[in-house]
């Protein structure tokens, strides 16, 4: 799947409440595992499909973000939703810091530094 995000994606793991209306107009609720997040979107793992184009509310302690489901794919352990936050809804670590949060750019930087210091020079 093509990654169209402009902002950096933060890997994370936390449970959030989700709410949406199904095709008959009934409100559905569930708990989702927040897989990653950026300023303008998130990836959520849920136990049932949510159709593309559905407006979804993601609630966390002290706040919520509204977005639209851009994709829903099944992968071995559940359904993964790509959610694009609606205008005026942007994620910020000041408002919500997931329980486990990792910036993969920092990890790559650390590995690169370690490789530079751990690799012996080549000898001809």
Residue ranges and their predicted role:
Residues 1-124:
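Structured alpha-helical
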């Amino acid at each position: 799947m093509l990654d169209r995000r402009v902002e950096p994606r933060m890997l994370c793991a936390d449970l959030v409440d989700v709410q949406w209306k199904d095709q008959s107009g009934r409100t559905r609720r569930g708990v989702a595992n927040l897989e990653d997040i950026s300023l303008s979107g998130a990836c959520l793992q849920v136990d049932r499909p949510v159709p593309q184009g559905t407006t979804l509310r993601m609630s966390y302690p002290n706040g919520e973000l509204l977005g639209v489901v851009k994709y829903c794919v099944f992968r071995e352990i559940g359904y993964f939703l790509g959610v694009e936050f609606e205008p005026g809804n942007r994620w910020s670590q000041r408002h919500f810091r997931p329980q486990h949060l990792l910036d993969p750019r920092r990890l790559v930087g650390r590995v690169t530094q370690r490789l530079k210091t751990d690799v012996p020079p080549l000898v001809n």
